[in-house]
Amino acid sequence: MERFKKASSIIETLKQQGHEAYFVGGSVRDLIIDRPIGDIDIATSALPEEVMAIFPRHVPVGLEHGTVIVVENGEPYEVTTFRTESEYEDFRRPSSVQFVRSLEEDLKRRDFTMNAIAMTEEGERIDLFAGQEAIQKREIVTVGTAADRFQEDALRMMRGIRFVSTLGFSLETKTKQAIETYGHLLEHIAIERITVEFEKLLTGTYCVKGLKELVETKLFSHLPYLQMSEERLLKATQYNWDSFETDIEAWAFFLYCIGEEHPSVFLRQWKFSNKKIKDIVAVLLTIRKRKEKDWDTVLLYKTGIHIAEMAERVYEAMIESYDHTSVERVQTLFQALPIKSRQEMDVTGNDLLNWASKKPGPWVAEMIQKIEEAIVQGNVVNEKECIREWLQECNLL
């Protein structure tokens, strides 16, 4: 409760001004489950302009949705006005938002009962939709009729399966049936929003369970490049996903499991950044080399420690080894390298030009590369004079 205590002054101030205010959403859910608390959100009967008038230190981030960030005790908190939503457009967003003074109306519009629990600053819970019962049963249940919730915002189906992966809960029967029925509506949702949820699924503690639900509900068939991947997705559930430390590793392993032959095309379709695509593809290419041979100094040097560590964890998962010392071995090998990058070489292109008395040309870059590999392989010490002598001995000058 310590983090809630730090934010309770916001609720107390709002109440002193005649408004209702409560902690809501995922933080209350995680407190009940005894999980680490993420962002703490507050819902209030105060209108956005009233919130801004009460708290001088604020950021008006989403006024059209009633959200104001209030900075209290050096921490930012989202304070959102109770609201209800009209008919949804395109199965993804309400055509309009109406601010209301009723907590019940606000909680009624939320996706799942476990996320529709409010809490006072004293810790008293307001649970109008049996969210605590669902948490006790470890079930994911929609607020109201599942068909209505998913037709309002089809992304909720993906969120439901993401919660299976992150919490280890199961989809309640009617909720699961509704996903099977309305899964096609996910095709109306922007891929960027789906990617966010899918990544949380892949990095969840119960990822295998989430992937199984993705297959059982057939929701996968409405995702880009996964329409024909049922058997491959089931293959992914046969592995242990516990060893990964980054989302890059999870995506690389997922692409390996589904046998994706053109990973960069897949990732662009899912709207990844160029940097992320580059890292994921680098991990996959490194694994391909790693399958052919064990690490040597040249492969490790060219790969770099960041990609090498991730590739090794994915490789261990692929061969179902789970030797936790393998990454440590890679780290030890890397630390033993004479140089970690070209910038550490004790010679430059200018040195070569002076020594050879030749005009600049492609030969300079080629020579630098030869010297670089010789240093990494231990054939020459990384000292200017030693390198010059080695070049002369090899008739390269």
Curated annotation (Swiss-Prot):
GO terms for molecular function: ATP binding; CCA tRNA nucleotidyltransferase activity; magnesium ion binding; tRNA binding. Its EC number is 2.7.7.72. This is CCA-adding enzyme. It catalyses: a tRNA precursor + 2 CTP + ATP = a tRNA with a 3' CCA end + 3 diphosphate; a tRNA with a 3' CCA end + 2 CTP + ATP = a tRNA with a 3' CCACCA end + 3 diphosphate. Mg(2+) binds at residues 39, 41. It holds the Pfam family PolyA_pol_RNAbd. SUPFAM superfamilies: Nucleotidyltransferase (SSF81301), Poly A polymerase C-terminal region-like (SSF81891). It comes from the Bacteria. Keywords: ATP-binding, Magnesium, Metal-binding, Nucleotide-binding, Nucleotidyltransferase, RNA repair, RNA-binding, Transferase, tRNA processing. Its cofactor is Mg(2+).
